[in-house]
């Protein structure tokens, strides 16, 4: 399969045309309009410093159904003991920076390049991108961020500085999404960590059907909060 070169037009080729490794297209930009269009088609950007923008739609796709979230006994104990104070949308920029820094500290390199940080901060300001923060002793101990459209949440990255911090943040996110009738969390690609939390692979065609159905519902847009009934601050 060829890799498609994007033009200035905010459109993408059919995801089914992606290569076997999931790579679909190259180029374009990270404007809010293009990013939202990509997510609505089951496509996401992923590239490293010095590379052009690469757009992916892997097959199979890793997703987590909130009702199938697996909580280990150690995580249950962590939540029961309230080791972390978890918040939503209070430190988006810091969470993104921490996700990038943790990977660099481990020598992994990061795809959260400055251009990507700016793009997702714009989505956050527009009410589409959200962060979950786990705090301990007033310090950011772990967290994650992603994008919300319809009744789908598209996870992007997570980090932890203290044991179980990111899992605690994820557990609170699952509880929040369940309360607001979200249908899935898109985890993108398979990892042992996500599989241990209950994520499962689905054929891309099945994922896209689920995506199209969930986009029929309104997006919970704005700053999220655990304190209000409607989920918004």
Curated annotation (Swiss-Prot):
Gene3D superfamilies: Leucyl/phenylalanyl-tRNA-protein transferase, C-terminal domain (3.40.630.70), Leucyl/phenylalanyl-tRNA-protein transferase, N-terminal domain (3.30.70.3550). It comes from Desulfatibacillum aliphaticivorans. This is Leucyl/phenylalanyl-tRNA--protein transferase. SUPFAM superfamilies: Acyl-CoA N-acyltransferases (Nat). The lineage of its organism: Bacteria, Pseudomonadati, Thermodesulfobacteriota, Desulfobacteria, Desulfobacterales. It catalyses: N-terminal L-lysyl-[protein] + L-leucyl-tRNA(Leu) = N-terminal L-leucyl-L-lysyl-[protein] + tRNA(Leu) + H(+); N-terminal L-arginyl-[protein] + L-leucyl-tRNA(Leu) = N-terminal L-leucyl-L-arginyl-[protein] + tRNA(Leu) + H(+); L-phenylalanyl-tRNA(Phe) + an N-terminal L-alpha-aminoacyl-[protein] = an N-terminal L-phenylalanyl-L-alpha-aminoacyl-[protein] + tRNA(Phe). GO terms for molecular function: leucyl-tRNA--protein transferase activity. Belongs to the L/F-transferase family. Its EC number is 2.3.2.6.
């Amino acid at each position: 399969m060829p890799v498609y070169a994007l033009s200035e037009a905010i459109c993408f080729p059919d995801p089914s045309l992606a290569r076997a490794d999931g790579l679909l297209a190259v180029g374009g930009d990270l404007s809010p309009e293009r990013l939202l269009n990509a997510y609505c088609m089951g496509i996401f950007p992923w590239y490293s410093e010095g590379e052009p923008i690469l757009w992916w739609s892997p097959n199979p796709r890793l997703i987590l159904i909130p009702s199938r979230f697996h909580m280990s006994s150690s995580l249950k104990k962590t939540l029961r003991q309230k080791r972390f104070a978890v918040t939503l949308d209070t430190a988006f920029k810091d969470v993104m920076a921490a996700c990038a820094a943790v990977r660099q500290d481990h020598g992994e390199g990061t795809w959260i390049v400055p251009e990507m940080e700016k793009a997702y901060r714009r989505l956050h300001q527009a009410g589409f991108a959200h962060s979950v923060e786990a705090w301990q002793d007033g310090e950011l101990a772990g967290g994650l961020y992603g994008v919300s459209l319809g009744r789908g949440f598209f996870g992007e990255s997570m980090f932890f500085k203290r044991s179980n911090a990111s899992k605690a943040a994820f557990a609170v996110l699952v509880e929040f999404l369940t309360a607001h009738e979200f249908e899935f969390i898109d985890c993108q690609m398979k990892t042992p960590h996500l599989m241990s939390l209950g994520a499962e692979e689905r054929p891309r065609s099945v994922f896209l059907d689920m995506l199209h159905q969930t986009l029929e519902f309104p997006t919970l847009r704005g700053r999220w909060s655990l304190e209000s009934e409607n989920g918004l601050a």
